[in-house]
Design a protein with these regions (language model features):
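Active-site-proximal or metal-binding-adjacent scaffold patches in catalytic folds
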Residues: 1-97, 107-141
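Walker B catalytic acidic pair
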Residues: 103
Length: 141
């Protein structure tokens, strides 16, 4: 039988030679372990990084939430809750920071107006480049 174990952020897969790697069941099992590893890393890193950036740039938010949405990297509610996709952990650190600054900026402007864009640019001058780069990645696992 196959076995999949997670140690920290390393996923070990052991399968007999005859295992059908393309089977839906096997793929789902692997996906579940990847999500578990991403969630563990995200829980450790993302709230601390968000807090650091908020303090550095004088933003405030009410709470944080980790998600695993399929189409969004993050969001900010009208009550100031910032949701962060665990798949952010698949990205380079500069793109993670861009997404977090983007969401923090929504605590001041709940839209994508010119004022919002200017605020993001103030704290991340490369935001256009990073926004473009982000399109090459997917929050899906």
């Amino acid at each position: 039988t196959s076995s999949v174990t997670t140690t920290g952020t390393t996923i070990f897969v052991s399968t007999p030679d005859e295992t059908e790697l393309a089977s839906a069941k096997f793929q789902q099992e692997i996906r579940e372990h990847i999500v578990k590893a991403l969630r563990k890393e995200a829980k450790s890193y993302l709230p601390r990084r968000l807090k650091y950036l908020a303090e550095k740039y004088d933003f405030s938010y009410s709470s944080t939430k980790l998600t695993h949405a399929s189409s969004r990297w993050g969001s900010c509610s009208s009550t100031g809750t910032i949701s962060m996709n665990i798949s952010l952990m698949k990205l380079p650190f500069e793109l993670i920071d861009y997404v977090l600054i983007h969401e923090l900026s929504h605590t001041k402007f709940m839209n994508h107006s010119d004022y919002f864009s200017q605020l993001v640019k103030t704290y991340e001058p490369n935001y256009i480049k990073y926004r473009r780069e982000l399109k090459n990645h997917s929050p899906n696992v």
